[in-house]
C-alpha cells in the first residue's frame, strides 16, 4: 500500500475545520423554509431548535442578540422562513445553521398579523358586547355584501327564498378576495348605510384558505363594520374559519347559509305561528263574547230589577211602611206627653208657689231696708273721717306754712336750704313764698349759737 503525501493526510480536527471553512465560504448566507421542532430556550436566552421538512432535518441556533428582534414566539410545528449561515461544530463534527433572522412563512405570517390586529382592536374595546346592535325581528329588508358570482350568494338566496319568499333582498356586489376586496367591502357597507334601504346586512363569502379569507381580516373592513349603523351579520367561510370581521360584527354566523337562516323567518314556522295565533285569537274572541254575554244577561236582570214600575211599587211599599211607623210613633209620643202632662199637673197642684213667693217678697223688702240703713251710716262715718284727714293734712301742708309767713329756699342744685353750711357768699338762692318765687344772692351768712339744754334735775330734789 502506497502512503499518501503528508499534505493529503487530515487529522479529524483539520478535516472538520476545513469542512467548516468550505461551507462558510461556499454557501454564505442562505434562506431556508422549514418547520420548527424541538424548540428550547435555556437560561442563556439563546434559542436552540431543529428545522425540518418531510425528508430531512438540521440543527439550528439563534443567539440572544438576534432573537430579541423576532416579533413572535416560535412554536413547535410552525412554518418559518429563516436567513442563516451554515457552519460545522468542529468538536462533534455536526453541521448546523446559525440563524440571523426569522419570520413566519405563508399562513404563519398571516396568522401573526391576525393575532396582532385582534389584540389591537380588542384593546380598543371594539369587540365589547355593549357595542353589539340587536338584529331586527323580523327583518323587513336584507342587504347582502358578497361576490355576485360566488357560491355564498347562491346559498343565501336559496335559503331566503325558501324560508321567506316575500322578504326583499338588496345585493351589494363586491370582490371578496384579492388586494381590491377590502376597500370594495368598505365602500359597500358605507353605501348601504347612506341609502338606509336595509335593516340588516350579511357580509361574507364561502370557504377558502386563510389567504383567501384575508380581506375579512383587514383593519379597514373591521372599522367599517364597527361604524355601521345597520346591524351586520358576518358569514365568512366555514364554521372553523374565524376572522376579525366575526369579532366586530353584531352577530357571527358559521356559514353564509346559517346567516340566512338566522335573520329570516321560516315560512312554515310563520304559518304555524299564524295558525296558533288565529286559534288563540278565536279562543280569546269566544271568551270575550261569552264574558260580554254574561255581562249583558246580568245587566238585563239588573235592568228588570230597576224597571220604573217595580221601583215605584217598592217605593210605595216603603212609603206605606214608613207612614205607618210614623203614625204609630207619633201616637205613642203623644200618649207619652199626655201622661207626663197629667203627672206634672198633679205635682203642680200639690206644690202651689204663691205662699212661698209672698214670703220671699217680704224678706226681700226687709233686706233692702236694712241695706239702705247700713249704707247711710257707713257713708256718714266715711265723710266724717275724710274731713278729719283733710284738716290734718292742711295743718302739715307746706303751703299752709307759707301762708303763715314762712318761706322755703333752695340752693342752685335744687336742694332745700337747711343750714348755712350749704351756701357761701355770692351764691344764688330761690325762695318760695305763698304767692311765688324770689331769687336772691347771699351777701353774708351768720350762724346762730345753739341753745344749751338745762341739766336734768335729780330725783332727790323733787
Curated annotation (Swiss-Prot):
Localization: Cytoplasm
Family matches, as Pfam families: Exonuc_VII_L (PF02601), tRNA_anti_2 (PF13742)
Tell me a Gene Ontology molecular-function term this record carries.
nucleic acid binding
Keywords attached to this entry: Cytoplasm, Exonuclease, Hydrolase, Nuclease
Q: What is its EC number?
A: 3.1.11.6
Task: Give me the reactions it catalyses.
Answer: Exonucleolytic cleavage in either 5'- to 3'- or 3'- to 5'-direction to yield nucleoside 5'-phosphates
The cross-references to CDD domains, in alphabetical order and at most eight, read: ExoVII_LU_OBF
Listed under GO cellular component are: cytoplasm; exodeoxyribonuclease VII complex
Kindly report the protein's main subcellular placement as a broad class. cytoplasm
A single BP term in Gene Ontology:
DNA catabolic process
Q: Which parts form a coiled-coil structure per UniProt?
A: none
Stated family: Belongs to the XseA family.
- Cite the NCBIfam families for this sequence: xseA
Its biological purpose: Bidirectionally degrades single-stranded DNA into large acid-insoluble oligonucleotides, which are then degraded further into small acid-soluble oligonucleotides.
Query: How does it associate, per the subunit comment?
Result: Heterooligomer composed of large and small subunits.
Protein's name according to its UniProt entry: Exodeoxyribonuclease 7 large subunit
Amino acid at each position: 500500500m502506497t502512503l499518501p503525501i503528508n499534505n493529503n493526510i487530515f487529522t479529524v480536527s483539520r478535516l472538520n475545520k476545513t469542512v467548516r471553512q468550505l461551507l462558510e465560504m461556499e454557501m454564505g448566507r442562505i434562506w431556508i423554509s422549514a418547520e420548527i421542532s424541538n424548540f428550547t430556550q435555556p437560561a442563556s436566552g439563546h434559542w436552540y431548535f431543529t428545522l425540518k421538512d418531510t425528508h430531512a432535518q438540521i440543527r439550528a441556533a439563534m443567539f440572544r442578540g438576534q432573537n430579541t428582534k423576532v416579533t413572535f414566539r416560535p412554536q413547535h410545528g410552525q412554518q418559518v422562513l429563516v436567513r442563516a449561515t451554515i457552519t460545522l461544530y468542529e468538536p462533534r463534527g455536526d453541521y448546523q445553521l446559525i440563524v440571523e433572522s426569522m419570520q413566519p412563512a405563508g399562513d404563519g405570517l398571516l396568522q401573526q398579523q391576525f393575532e396582532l390586529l385582534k389584540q389591537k382592536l380588542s384593546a380598543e374595546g371594539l369587540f365589547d358586547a355593549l357595542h353589539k346592535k340587536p338584529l331586527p325581528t323580523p327583518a323587513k329588508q336584507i342587504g347582502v355584501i358578497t361576490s355576485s358570482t360566488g357560491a355564498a350568494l347562491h346559498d343565501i338566496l336559496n335559503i331566503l327564498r325558501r324560508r321567506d319568499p316575500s322578504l326583499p333582498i338588496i345585493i351589494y356586489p363586491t370582490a371578496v378576495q384579492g388586494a381590491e376586496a377590502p376597500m370594495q367591502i368598505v365602500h359597500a357597507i358605507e353605501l348601504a348605510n347612506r341609502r338606509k334601504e336595509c335593516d340588516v346586512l350579511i357580509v361574507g363569502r364561502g370557504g377558502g384558505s386563510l389567504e383567501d379569507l384575508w380581506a375579512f381580516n383587514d383593519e379597514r373592513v373591521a372599522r367599517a363594520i364597527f361604524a355601521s349603523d345597520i346591524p351586520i351579520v358576518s358569514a365568512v367561510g366555514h364554521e372553523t374559519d374565524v376572522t376579525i370581521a366575526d369579532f366586530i360584527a353584531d352577530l357571527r354566523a358559521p356559514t353564509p347559509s346559517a346567516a340566512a337562516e338566522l335573520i329570516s323567518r321560516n315560512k312554515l314556522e310563520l304559518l304555524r305561528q299564524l295558525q296558533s295565533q288565529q286559534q288563540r285569537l278565536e279562543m280569546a274572541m269566544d271568551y270575550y263574547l261569552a264574558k260580554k254575554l254574561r255581562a249583558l244577561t246580568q245587566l238585563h236582570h239588573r235592568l228588570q230589577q230597576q224597571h220604573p214600575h217595580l221601583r215605584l211599587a217598592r217605593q210605595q211599599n216603603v212609603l206605606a211602611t214608613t207612614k205607618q211607623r210614623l203614625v204609630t210613633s207619633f201616637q205613642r209620643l203623644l200618649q207619652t206627653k199626655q201622661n207626663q202632662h197629667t203627672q206634672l199637673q198633679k205635682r203642680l197642684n200639690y206644690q202651689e208657689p204663691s205662699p212661698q213667693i209672698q214670703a220671699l217678697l217680704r224678706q226681700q223688702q226687709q233686706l233692702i231696708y236694712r241695706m239702705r240703713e247700713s249704707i247711710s251710716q257707713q257713708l256718714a262715718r266715711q265723710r266724717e273721717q275724710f274731713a278729719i284727714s283733710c284738716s290734718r293734712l292742711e295743718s302739715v301742708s307746706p303751703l299752709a306754712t307759707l301762708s303763715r309767713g314762712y318761706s322755703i329756699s333752695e340752693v342752685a342744685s335744687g336742694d332745700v336750704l337747711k343750714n348755712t353750711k350749704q351756701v357761701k357768699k355770692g351764691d344764688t338762692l330761690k325762695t318760695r313764698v305763698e304767692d311765688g318765687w324770689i331769687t336772691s344772692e347771699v351777701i353774708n351768712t351768720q350762724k346762730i349759737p345753739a341753745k344749751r339744754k338745762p341739766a336734768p334735775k335729780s330725783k332727790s330734789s323733787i
